[in-house]
């Protein structure tokens, strides 16, 4: 890739509002074909989330233009926990949990076509004395304490374990530069301090490429309130389809505001900027059609879950919100629905049973919905409470209940 092409690539990252800071654009422009860039992912859960996907998509963008990339899974750093801009100490994971997380996230990253390296390989044979002599000797404690990411935690308390995190992440960079010619590191904007520590380790080394290393950060994926998409706020949008279905991701993206949809489209989609601008123009001409949101949902769900995941998401959306003819709902569709809407198994089915299940608070409420023609079972409008019988079951012994416009329930007769 030529110098000019790299300039154009960086300019596009700025236009998409992906790029936050870069230590040296010139060093990125002069990146050699055998040199590469990495991003780290700590295995603190069984799945990565949408906040991580901006980093995954960045590696894919770099890969697409011919730059060597590496996804580094934090088998070592995950044991410690990154304190950067965190308000409290992170809970340490036991080895069994960490290793299970590691395996799942490794498969997840590989599913996006990314090569993966586990940083535990760097430290598994290093003892504490080696670490203090080789790593600790090369860094000044006052330099570390001055970092904003550390200073923000000093007053509330910072353990030596978490304090050491930036040393390990920094040493990762030096090791990868020395052994794999990985001289660039990217990450979220909250990682700047840790990444610059790695630059310092490299500058103090005897590497022939020590003056070529650089780091750059991306803006964090945030909601309308400026809160980052992640798991720490308690509402993670997992990339694992078993933990957060393609349908739920599709709906999440469909329900974004115009401003937020435009922002996420630029961040996460691989559509050309010209195409995105055309979609924005069409959307503004008739906002009720939600052209931007539909295209955003389509692009991101396809990129994360593939064609099958997108088709499932679109089909379930039709079933639940566009009143698809019940006869066109397949058995596989029903299996997917069971994962998405409240699902119950019962040995008998009648009006009292659906009240006992909590679908209706009382017989009075049930009758109110029936009188307003607001209860459907397997596509049939219920006009009388006595119509709620097992005769309504389908061939799979299933009942799909629609309560009003928004609430759905699946009941299986066993």
From Swiss-Prot:
Motif 'KMSKS' region per UniProt: ranges: 228-232
GO CC terms, sorted: cytosol
Keyword line: Aminoacyl-tRNA synthetase, ATP-binding, Cytoplasm, Ligase, Nucleotide-binding, Protein biosynthesis, RNA-binding
Motif segment ('HIGH' region): 43-52
Molecular-function annotations in GO: ATP binding; RNA binding; tyrosine-tRNA ligase activity
SUPFAM superfamilies, sorted: Alpha-L RNA-binding motif (SSF55174), Nucleotidylyl transferase (SSF52374)
Top-level class of the enzyme under EC nomenclature: ligase
Domain of life (superkingdom): Bacteria
Positions annotated to bind L-tyrosine: 38, 165, 169
Catalytic activity: tRNA(Tyr) + L-tyrosine + ATP = L-tyrosyl-tRNA(Tyr) + AMP + diphosphate + H(+)
EC number(s) per entry: 6.1.1.1
GO BP annotations listed: tyrosyl-tRNA aminoacylation
Main subcellular location of this protein, as a coarse class: cytoplasm
Gene3D superfamilies on file: HUPs (3.40.50.620), RNA-binding S4 domain (3.10.290.10), Tyrosyl-Transfer RNA Synthetase (1.10.240.10)
S4 RNA-binding domain span: 349-414
NCBIfam families xrefs: tyrS
Protein name in the entry: Tyrosine--tRNA ligase
Organism: Mesomycoplasma hyopneumoniae (strain 7448) (Mycoplasma hyopneumoniae)
Source species taxonomy: Bacteria, Bacillati, Mycoplasmatota, Mycoplasmoidales, Metamycoplasmataceae
């Amino acid at each position: 890739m030529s110098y000019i092409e790299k300039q154009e690539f960086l300019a596009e990252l700025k236009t998409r509002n992906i790029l936050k800071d870069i230590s040296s654009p010139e060093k990125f422009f002069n990146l050699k074909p055998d040199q590469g860039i990495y991003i780290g992912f700590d295995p603190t859960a069984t799945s990565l989330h949408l906040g991580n996907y901006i980093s995954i998509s960045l590696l894919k963008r770099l890969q697409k233009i011919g730059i060597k990339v590496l996804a580094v899974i934090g088998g070592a750093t995950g044991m410690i926990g990154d304190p950067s801009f965190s308000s409290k100490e992170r809970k340490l994971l036991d080895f069994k949990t960490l290793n299970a997380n590691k395996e799942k996230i490794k498969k997840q990253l590989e599913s996006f076509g990314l090569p993966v390296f586990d940083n535990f390989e760097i430290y598994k044979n290093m003892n504490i004395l080696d670490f203090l002599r080789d790593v600790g000797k090369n860094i000044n404690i006052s330099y570390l304490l001055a970092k904003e990411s550390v200073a923000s935690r000093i007053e509330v308390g910072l353990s030596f374990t978490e304090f050491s995190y930036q040393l390990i992440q920094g040493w990762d960079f030096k090791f990868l530069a020395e052994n794999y010619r990985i001289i660039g590191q990217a990450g979220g904007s909250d990682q700047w301090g840790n990444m610059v520590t790695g630059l310092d380790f490299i500058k103090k080394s005897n590497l022939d490429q020590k003056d070529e290393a650089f780091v750059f950060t991306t803006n964090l994926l945030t909601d309308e309130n400026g809160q980052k998409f992640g798991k720490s706020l308690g509402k993670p949008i997992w990339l694992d389809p078993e933990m957060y279905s393609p349908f739920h991701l599709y709906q999440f993206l469909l329900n974004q505001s115009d401003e937020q949809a435009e922002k996420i489209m630029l961040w996460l989609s691989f559509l050309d900027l010209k195409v995105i601008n055309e979609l924005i123009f069409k959307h503004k001409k008739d906002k009720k059609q939600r052209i931007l949101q539909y295209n955003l949902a389509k692009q991101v769900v396809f990129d994360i879950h593939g064609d099958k995941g997108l088709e499932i998401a679109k089909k379930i959306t039709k079933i639940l919100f566009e009143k698809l003819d019940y006869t066109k709902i397949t058995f596989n569709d029903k299996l997917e629905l069971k994962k998405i809407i409240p699902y119950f198994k019962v040995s008998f089915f009648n009006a009292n049973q659906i009240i006992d299940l909590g679908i209706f608070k009382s017989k009075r409420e049930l009758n109110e919905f029936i009188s307003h023609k607001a209860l459907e079972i397997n596509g049939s409008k219920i006009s009388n409470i006595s119509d709620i019988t097992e005769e309504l079951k389908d061939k799979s012994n299933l009942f799909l209940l629609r309560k009003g416009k928004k609430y759905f329930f699946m009941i299986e007769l066993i």
